[in-house]
Curated annotation (Swiss-Prot):
Gene that produces this protein: rlmH
Enzyme class: transferase
The organism of origin for this protein: Streptococcus pyogenes serotype M12 (strain MGAS2096)
Protein family per UniProt: Belongs to the RNA methyltransferase RlmH family.
Catalytic activity reported: pseudouridine(1915) in 23S rRNA + S-adenosyl-L-methionine = N(3)-methylpseudouridine(1915) in 23S rRNA + S-adenosyl-L-homocysteine + H(+)
GO molecular function (one): rRNA (pseudouridine-N3-)-methyltransferase activity
Lineage: Bacteria, Bacillati, Bacillota, Bacilli, Lactobacillales
Taxonomy, superkingdom: Bacteria
Name of the protein in question: Ribosomal RNA large subunit methyltransferase H
Keyword annotations from UniProtKB, A to Z: Cytoplasm, Methyltransferase, rRNA processing, S-adenosyl-L-methionine, Transferase
Chain residues that bind S-adenosyl-L-methionine: L76, G108, F127, G128, L129, L130, T131, L132
Membrane spanning residue stretches: none
Amino acid sequence: MKVKLICVGKLKERYLKDGISEYQKRLSRFCQFEMIELTDERTPDKASFADNQLIMSKEAQRIHKKIEERDFVIALAIEGKQFPSETFSELISGVTVKGYSTITFIIGGSLGLDSIIKKRANMLMSFGLLTLPHQLMRLVLTEQIYRAFMITQGSPYHK
């Protein structure tokens, strides 16, 4: 199984890189994990709605190029479904049973995701109504993916 994490923007903070690197190492027992960082568009200070739409559209084009036709795509969006960790674990296990070999998670940039990416997604997922920096969300999601595999294994990691 392959798990891809497509992210808009570059990870800058060392502590986030270290945390994600640790979970990538742990995940290597269960899957091939790949994090793909895409260039984000600069958003002007007083960007109009049209400016924001254009920025999201450009970012969506970059994202779309990294999605394979047979990927099961889960896009993170505030309006998405929320799951307890156990249900998330079942979801990941169920995707492979349905014949998908790659799960692709998408985290948009500071403006979110363009509707074309949300429409392509097999599922929209949310971590709640809180607003989190998208760079921090990478670490949180990577940990939850690891936790999902540990739950499937019956590991005491998830208590």
